[in-house]
Amino acid sequence: MSERVILAYSGGLDTSVAISWIGKETGREVVAVAIDLGQGGEDMDVVRQRALDCGAVEAVVIDARDEFAEDYCLPAIQSNALYMDRYPLVSALSRPLIVKHLVDAAREHKGGIVAHGCTGKGNDQVRFEVGFASLAPDLEVLAPVRDYAWTREKAIAFAEENAIPINVTKRSPFSIDQNVWGRAVETGFLEHLWNAPTKDVYDYTEDPTLNWSTPDEVIVGFDKGVPVSIDGRDVTVLQAIEELNRRAGAQGVGRLDVVEDRLVGIKSREIYEAPGAMVLITAHTELEHVTLERELGRFKRTTDQKWGELVYDGLWFSPLKTALESFVAKTQEHVSGEIRLVLHGGHIAVNGRRSQESLYDFNLATYDEGDTFDQSSAKGFVHVHGLSSSISARRDLGIK
């Protein structure tokens, strides 16, 4: 088996240190794989050069923005995926895509080992390693941060001692993960639950308490559950996310301060920014309310929750998730139409819906003249619907 190590490289502290550490401590060559998921910030050529400067024998940059949007974010939209009803899976969605490209790189560069920079406390170690086990069980996995108990202080010290070009200090110890779907910030003073986030924590969104901005009204169009237009203009899924990130972010939409239950059994505090994601999920959910039959909608809400839990728990490649997506695909056949939303002050307000597939019948719903609902049928329906409750109540109350 080859001694080459294929490393998931972010350009950040832990993976930059990992390149140098693997070379120095094990003598193995490192191929760094950096994936553009629309995270912005540094130019990917700069990230690639940093990997080489840290000691990688090769550094590969992959533009996966459209793939991420179409194959990972879109299923999350269609499953209205919010872990614990709040978190739109910002990091969790990206991990299986990274796994896929690392496995491909291992085959191409004849590497027998794949590596990541995850700690032993987080969910990402599970997402990576279960993914590797699902796609390439023959590959060995190296996790230096976890297996050698690196702390951020130790990593910073190693970076300083070895002149690793990374801009992190003990005074600004935030751990940040971001992509086009959103941004996650943790560690530092945020680990104390009573501490309020400071302005420097945020980047994708403006302060929602500043009400100087004019409300932004946006119309999002869907075709079979796929976002296809904004204000009547055709867009790809990636373009929809990017535009709504800008517009909703300018209105302070998408800030989330969450204490979540990690897969490893601990609770953690995370600050998320996901303006585009929250708008798209809100709009899609609302369109489903209009177009899905009641029992289908009720059941889908249970599968939506399960889908999100599976992705959060690192089971992207599981048979159950695959089966759930077949069900979700069937539910989307009539999820077409437009949702109008107002973005302002950190809030999303739906104020309009229209669809050729709508199950809303005005003549049945109206209380005004033109009502076609046969109210005479209601009395019998109510009696039959409550019959079992009535029978049990008579027994329990001793009424014959």
Swiss-Prot record:
Biological processes per GO annotation: argininosuccinate metabolic process; L-arginine biosynthetic process; urea cycle
Subcellular location: Cytoplasm
UniProt name for this protein: Argininosuccinate synthase
Residues reported to bind ATP: 8-16, 117
Presence of keyword Transferase: no
Catalyzed chemical reaction(s): L-citrulline + L-aspartate + ATP = 2-(N(omega)-L-arginino)succinate + AMP + diphosphate + H(+)
GO molecular function, one term: ATP binding
PROSITE patterns in UniProt: ARGININOSUCCIN_SYN_1, ARGININOSUCCIN_SYN_2
One GO term describing the cellular component: cytoplasm
Group of enzyme by EC: ligase
SUPFAM superfamilies per the UniProt record, alphabetical: Adenine nucleotide alpha hydrolases-like (SSF52402), Argininosuccinate synthetase, C-terminal domain (SSF69864)
Binding-site residues, L-citrulline: 87, 123, 127, 175, 260, 272
Record carries keyword Amino-acid biosynthesis: yes
Keywords tagged on the record: Amino-acid biosynthesis, Arginine biosynthesis, ATP-binding, Cytoplasm, Ligase, Nucleotide-binding
CDD domains reported in the protein's UniProt record: ASS (cd01999)
The encoding gene: argG
Residues involved in L-aspartate binding: 119, 123-124
Family (UniProt): Belongs to the argininosuccinate synthase family. Type 1 subfamily.
Main location: cytoplasm
Pathway recorded for this protein: Amino-acid biosynthesis; L-arginine biosynthesis; L-arginine from L-ornithine and carbamoyl phosphate: step 2/3
Enzyme Commission code: 6.3.4.5
Assembly information from the UniProt record: Homotetramer.
